[in-house]
Design a protein with these regions (language model features):
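Domain-level signal for soluble alpha/beta catalytic cores
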Residues: 1-356
Length: 356
């Protein structure tokens, strides 16, 4: 149990050394799952220990087993194929749902957590992709509609699968289940909202499906992570403050909402005044995209901007996003270590000033 102010965490993914990237790519193509899992089991303790050495309070396994934070659903269920799709003018390889989803590897997230428990006594957080996000990225009208006629049909079928994964995480003793939904956060941008016939209905639906997953499940803290997409050194996708989505977030039956505030397009922290006080706030106060290593003092300054509107008891520190949402991300691991180490130092400075 964490009983001090300004606890620290990561968002989930940590940079992977090149040999792990190569292993993931080989496993994806050749489907040698058992060999891959046996090997990665011997490697993951390194990233667990790295977070412990930095002093992070709530740790993950770095998502080193995953090709991506979204595509992990294809590791849990059959029904997906690797396809080449045009995304924003670029041909990219995506998992696309092409047949009925059948759980083939249930409890995958809980098994990730069980490995962490073997090597650390720290609190554990595991990230899951939201059903709305999965459907946005992995349903294709031409390839998927014969089995799931609409994107919404696909989304609805994801809900019971993710609900069972959440229950298994709770039963494994995980402290926090974090649902990732950067697509929901894109609706902060008026240019993106303009592409939808009824963006308000889209936002509300993304909240509704999350609430249906977690309904009646207690014994685990629930967090929602929001960001404007993480393109690494290339930056982000959407721009704008959170105010357009705050009324919808207030309907969320979660305990914590995680916001990014390091990037210059995130708006003003005064938006927290519009957020229901029942929510704890995850404050993105460490850059995960650029080369600059935030100093502890820079991180403290960002947190103190939020403290103008939020009590210290509600704030958890974290980077804006994961350092490597996809396995191909090229952020150096030593850079990430220095950043999260400074995050911990900032937390200690803040506690010395605000802990009573």
């Amino acid at each position: 149990m964490i009983n001090h102010l300004f606890p620290t965490t990561t968002v989930g993914s940590m940079p992977r050394p090149q040999y792990i990237k190569d292993m993931i790519e080989y496993q994806t193509i050749n489907n040698q799952t058992t060999q891959f899992q046996n090997t990665i089991d011997r490697i993951v303790p390194f990233i667990i220990e790295m977070q412990d050495q930095a002093g992070i309070d709530i740790i993950s396994d770095g998502e080193w087993r995953r090709k991506s934070y979204i595509g992990v659903i294809a590791d849990i269920c059959s029904g997906f194929e690797l396809t080449i799709r045009n995304v924003n003018g670029e041909n990219q390889t995506w998992h696309t749902v092409t047949s009925k989803m059948i759980p083939k590897n249930p409890g995958l997230f809980a098994r990730e957590a069980s490995t962490i428990k073997k090597y650390s006594k720290s609190a554990i957080k595991v990230a899951l992709p939201s059903p709305y996000l999965i459907a946005e990225r992995m349903w294709d009208k031409n390839l998927s509609s014969h089995i799931y006629p609409t994107r919404k049909d696909f989304t609805e079928n994801l809900i019971p699968i993710l609900r069972q994964e959440l229950i298994k995480l709770r039963d494994e003793g995980v402290s926090i289940a974090q649902f990732d939904d950067p697509h929901l956060c894109l609706f902060v941008d008026p240019k993106i909202r303009s592409k939808y016939k009824n963006p308000e209905l889209e936002i509300q639906y993304s909240i509704d499906v999350l609430n249906r997953i977690v309904e009646g499940i207690d014994g685990i803290k629930l967090a929602l992570h929001l960001c404007r997409r993480n393109k690494g050194r290339s930056g982000w996708i959407a721009e704008g403050g959170y105010l357009p989505i705050i009324p919808f977030l207030n309907n969320l039956k979660f305990d914590m909402i995680m916001f990014e505030f390091t990037i210059p397009v995130a708006g003003d922290e005064s938006v927290f005044l519009e957020l229901d006080e029942r929510f704890d706030i995850g404050l993105g106060c460490v850059d995960c995209r650029g080369e600059h290593i935030d100093t502890p003092e820079e991180i403290v300054s960002r947190v103190e901007k939020a403290l103008q509107y939020v009590t210290p008891e509600r704030i958890t520190l974290h980077p804006d996003c994961g350092f490597a949402p996809g396995s191909a991300a090229d952020i150096p691991i030593d850079e990430a270590f220095r950043k999260i180490s400074n995050e911990v130092k900032a937390s200690m400075i803040l506690r010395s000033k605000y802990q009573r």
